[in-house]
């Protein structure tokens, strides 16, 4: 009625951190690193540096050949949610106008735990998605959508060599001292303008499709989460 296009949510996702458990365990045992250290963004940066240095030490005759530990699928989620965790909205909308909140100290924290470790080789983004980088052995862990879990590899392939791997699933990290806020994202459907009969039929379908039983079947097949709270319990 107001000329706007609305999307009706049919599937949801959030973010998680997934780890190549098979290659994580030798590193963790050798360095005393724990999974709990990955609970914060700063902790991941510290662990990634430690992993880079540990892998570099494995070849003392070859300097500066440490390996990246981590990557992220969505830079925008990192900045938007990271700022929110630290108590600020990076995009503030009022009366239809958007203001960019560039708090220098907070942006610096985000920069130091994203761009800096990428430049130093502690993080890496080489393939289209970070699950691709896990498969090629270029990283050990990544933060990405829950819907990407189905693509997490069961083997690592490096050249002509391949070996099976297991995995660990953790919460996505929180900025140190920040609020535990996670991203909410997902897919939706729209009903386009046509005639009353088709519009009504489409609305009935969407209502049926998002009911608990139907929606659960759909999201289990598509690796998403249901849109109704009752279906998540």
Where are these regions (language model features)?
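A structural signal for short loop-to-beta-strand junctions that line the ligand-binding cleft
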Residues: 1-24, 168-182
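Extracytoplasmic/periplasmic solute-binding protein
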Residues: 2-17, 42-99, 139
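Short, solvent-exposed loop/beta-turn-alpha elements that line the ligand-binding surface or hinge
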Residues: 33-37, 62-64, 69, 88-109, ...
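Short helix-initiation/N-cap motifs at beta->coil->alpha
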Residues: 39-43, 123-136
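Glycine-centered hinge/linker elements that transmit conformational signals in sensory
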Residues: 45-52, 93-127, 172
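Extracytoplasmic/periplasmic substrate-recognition and gating elements
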Residues: 108, 120, 158-232
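Paired acidic/hydrophobic, glycine-rich loop segments that form the ligand-binding mouth/hinge
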Residues: 140-145
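A ligand-binding cleft/hinge motif common to bilobed small-molecule-binding domains
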Residues: 146-163
């Amino acid at each position: 009625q107001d000329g706007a296009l609305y999307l009706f949510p049919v599937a949801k996702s959030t973010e998680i951190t997934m780890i190549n458990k098979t290659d994580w365990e030798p590193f963790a045992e050798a360095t005393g690193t724990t999974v709990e250290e990955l609970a914060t963004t700063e902790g991941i940066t510290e662990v990634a540096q430690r992993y880079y240095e540990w892998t570099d030490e494995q070849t003392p005759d070859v300097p500066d050949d440490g390996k990246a530990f981590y990557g992220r699928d969505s830079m925008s989620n990192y900045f938007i949610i990271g700022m929110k965790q630290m108590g600020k909205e990076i995009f503030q909308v009022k009366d239809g106008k958007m203001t960019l909140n560039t708090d220098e100290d907070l942006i610096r924290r985000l920069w130091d735990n994203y761009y800096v470790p990428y430049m130093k080789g502690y993080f890496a983004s080489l393939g289209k998605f970070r699950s691709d980088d896990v498969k090629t052995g270029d990283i050990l862990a990544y933060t990405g959508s829950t819907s990407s879990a189905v693509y997490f590899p069961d083997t690592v392939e490096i050249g002509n060599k391949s070996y099976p791997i297991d995995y660990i699933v953790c919460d996505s990290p929180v900025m140190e001292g920040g609020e535990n806020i996670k991203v909410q994202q997902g897919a939706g459907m729209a009903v386009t303008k046509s005639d009353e009969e088709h519009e009504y039929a489409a609305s009935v379908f969407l209502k049926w499709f998002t009911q608990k039983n139907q929606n659960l079947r759909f999201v289990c097949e598509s690796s998403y989460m249901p849109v109704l709270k009752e279906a998540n319990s």
